[in-house]
Regions:
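Low-complexity, acidic/polar, glycine-enriched regions of mature
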Residues: 1-192
Length: 192
């Protein structure tokens, strides 16, 4: 708690009076990555993609996201960039997710609330992948390592069947439907 001018306490950044402007951040595609860790009958297979684009609008106070002003974000993941380095596996994954027909996965933030004073937030939004839109919820860590830079990290387990995707199979290899998704984003203050 921090004492304000009238001697009353408030939580820095969380109970600021409404009306403060949000700060817009632009995701740096060179510093943003998505990692999918799929389990298979032959062990884990890791697919990754860079080049994530999008924007984030948040009110920052005291080095934290102040959620009294609802944050907003939209991320676009280029599905065709998903790769594990094995051409056969890559081709099968891109075929199963119909990457030519659905070249981007889109995440739209709809709400966030702090989890104590930990720098972690419960987030809710929608994910559109393979032409299917689903509500999602999870936890992300947010930090501001330097002025004008935001770092977001999160992890979530998704079932590909919820997006009408048949789990990939190549020869004797079978990939299980639940996939661990890890996200790392770095964003800089957007300048008009």
């Amino acid at each position: 708690m921090i004492a304000n001018g009238n001697g009353a306490g408030h939580r820095a950044g969380l109970d600021e009076p409404p009306g403060h402007a949000s700060t817009s951040f632009r995701i740096d595609p060179d510093r943003a990555a998505l990692v999918l860790v799929a389990r298979s009958n032959a062990g884990p297979i890791t697919f990754g993609a860079t080049g994530i684009e999008g924007s984030i609008s948040v009110h920052v106070a005291g080095g934290e996201v102040a959620t009294h002003v609802p944050p907003a974000a939209r991320l676009e993941v280029p599905v065709q960039r998903l790769t594990c380095g094995n051409g056969l596996y890559d081709a099968e994954l891109l075929r199963r997710v119909d990457a030519r027909l659905f070249p981007r996965a889109v995440v739209e933030l709809q709400g966030a609330s702090p989890i104590g004073a930990t720098g972690r937030y419960h987030v809710e939004g929608v994910l559109t992948f393979h032409g299917v839109t689903r509500s999602m919820a999870g936890t992300v860590a947010v930090s501001f390592p330097e002025p004008g830079r935001m770092v977001i990290e999160g992890e979530q387990v998704l079932d590909m069947r919820h997006f009408e995707i048949t789990p990939p199979a190549v020869a004797m290899l079978r990939i299980y439907p639940e996939v661990r998704v890890q996200l790392h984003l770095e964003a800089d203050t957007a300048h008009p």
